[in-house]
């Protein structure tokens, strides 16, 4: 069996334009591609009759983040809590965590101010406009 390699992290959003603006403005990520997909094969693959999706692929320093808004829109849910089983987050690295934190727009939700863990790692968790968790690490 061929060994798999990581391709992207996918994040489902309700408002693709708002999500793209957040990730490009907050993290200075570049948009690699924007496209829509529909048809019977796609609907079968996502197991939703008649589903279509609008996608944006973003470059996160060689890693790819895929934002996708489905139609029909998925039912909303509570934002994920980091400590709950099944919670997923994206980790993005910055050179200066304090400068990143100070430069955040007022509307960006943070779980705390930048912290240094017992292992010496400097981290900060923020939420995107959809409530998805993003870990920002200083490297």
Q: Whereabouts are the PLM-identified features?
A:
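Short hydrophobic-acidic sequence motifs that mark active-site Asp/Glu residues
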Residues: 64-66, 133
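Hydrophobic side chains in well-ordered alpha-helices
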Residues: 19-22, 100-104
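Vicinal oxygen chelate
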Residues: 2, 7-14, 54-63, 70, 77-139, ...
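Haloarchaeal acidic low-complexity proteome signature biased toward cell-envelope/secretome components but also
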Residues: 1-5, 10, 19, 29, ...
């Amino acid at each position: 069996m061929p060994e798999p390699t990581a391709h992207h992290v996918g994040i489902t959003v309700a408002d693709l334009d708002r999500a793209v603006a957040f990730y490009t403005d907050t993290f200075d990520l570049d948009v690699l591609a924007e496209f829509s997909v529909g048809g019977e094969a796609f609907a079968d693959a996502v197991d939703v009759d008649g589903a279509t999706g609008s996608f944006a692929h973003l470059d996160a320093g060689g890693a790819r983040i895929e934002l996708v808004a489905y139609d029909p829109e998925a039912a909303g849910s509570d934002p994920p809590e980091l400590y709950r089983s099944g919670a997923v987050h994206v980790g993005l690295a910055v050179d200066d965590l304090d400068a990143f934190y100070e430069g955040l727009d007022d509307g960006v939700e943070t779980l705390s101010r930048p912290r240094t863990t017992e292992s010496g790692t400097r981290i900060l968790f923020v939420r995107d406009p959809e409530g998805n968790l993003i870990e920002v690490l200083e490297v």
